[in-house]
Amino acid sequence: MTTKLFGTDGIRGKANEYPITPEITLRIGQAISRVLRSSGANHNRVIIGKDTRISGYMLETALTSGLVSSGMDVFLVGPMPTPAVAHLTKSMGCGAGIMLTASHNPYEDNGLKIFGPDGFKLSDDLEALVEQEVLYDVKANGVTGDKIGKAYRIDDARGRYIEFVKQSLGNAHLDGMKI
């Protein structure tokens, strides 16, 4: 097993091979929950988005299981651009946002990009804590009963992001512009 999970922009690799396996992804979810709580974050909500890679469904399920088993509520927004997940993390008051994507890497790959409550990349210090918990197999203190988190599908996430983008343009006109 490697001693490093995070690269320059999250965790990436070939889907269903270490570290992008359901088992490790579940542990990442549990670790994120513990790190958020120990950092004093008063958030028990996490948003998860993904790109259209087939492995996204497998990883989304594992990640959700890790988070809800640790008491986090999860908002699933489905296929969404990475900047949308960053924006929704902040605008929905979530403690973290996680994008399941390997960006420009081959379709067989996948990865996790984690945002803090401000909608920016998780700090290096918090990434290091998540990494330690996963690599050193820190045992999860699962919650029981009504402390177990819930998972929700957010059907209007795309519309929320589109409205944000339109508002950010102000009165700018795109007449005559071509792509």
Predicted regions located by residue number:
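A residue-level signal for conserved active-site and pocket-lining positions in enzyme catalytic cores
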Residues: 9, 85, 165
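Ferredoxin-reductase
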Residues: 33, 41-118
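Short, N-terminal intrinsically disordered low-complexity segments that are rich in Pro/Gly
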Residues: 14-26, 45, 49-52
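Glycine-rich phosphate/diphosphate-binding loops that line cofactor/substrate pockets in enzymes
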Residues: 29-46, 169-175
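N-terminal amphipathic/basic leader segments beginning at the initiator methionine
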Residues: 1-19
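Gly/Ser/Thr-enriched, mixed-charge loops and adjacent short helices
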Residues: 1, 14, 110-179
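Electropositive phosphate-/nucleotide-binding environments in soluble metabolic enzymes
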Residues: 5, 18-26, 30, 57, ...
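A generic structural signal for well-ordered alpha-helical segments enriched in polar/charged residues
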Residues: 30-34, 38, 65, 69, ...
